Amino acid sequence: MATPVMIWFDPMCPWAWITSRWLLEVQRVRDIDISWQVMSLAILNEGRPIPPEYADAMANAWKPVRVVIAAEHDHGASVVAPLYTALGERIHLRGRTDYDAIIREALEEVGLPATIAEVGTSTEVDDILRASHERGIGLVGDDVGTPVISVPGPSGEPIAFFGPIMTPAPKGEEAGRLWDGTLLVAGTPGFYELKRSRDAEPQFD
């Protein structure tokens, strides 16, 4: 029986993108069933001081998450993964920042109505977005970011954690071994943190 895995992501986050591609690789070598959930860096950083160089990014961060949550609400959970991939390939692999065009193209690629793009600059789905965000961040605390992953523990209780953060994403059995180790560490009672400073920028492949 496949292990259900929930991942909360923000399409704008390069580290979440890498982790999500790793999970897809894990799915090739381990029996897991991924459920894609939305969280928001814009919500996470509300009320926090934002360095000027990140202000525009935070303002634009609302658009993709609103579009993804609206697409899920109107068309079901099955559209989330392909829409995320279509957005992420443009944002991260191609390095584009023309978000309105990115959203229009991504919606067209996955066969969703172009009108969904309109919610990117409105607040009409924000309650749904905030609820999804809180479900994820409520599992790990608000002093972390995206991605958040949750899996069932031995007794069915959720085991949740931020990350793992890596670059580049491992492939094949290396991806599976990292998954095995992550579950072992995260499932250890009383374990909270294992960290070292990053010395590389996100590497996409």
Give residue ranges: language-model regions.
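Extreme N-terminal starter segment of soluble prokaryotic enzymes
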Residues: M1-M6
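Structural alpha/beta surface segment adjacent to cysteine/selenocysteine redox centers
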Residues: W8, W17-R104, G181-V185, E193, ...
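Charge-dense, low-complexity intrinsically disordered segments
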Residues: D10-C13, Y54, M58, V119, ...
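The canonical Cys-X-X-Cys-His
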Residues: C13-A16, I149
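Short amphipathic alpha-helical surface micro-motifs
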Residues: A16-T19, R130-S132
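C-terminal cap of thioredoxin/glutaredoxin-like
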Residues: L24, D98-D205
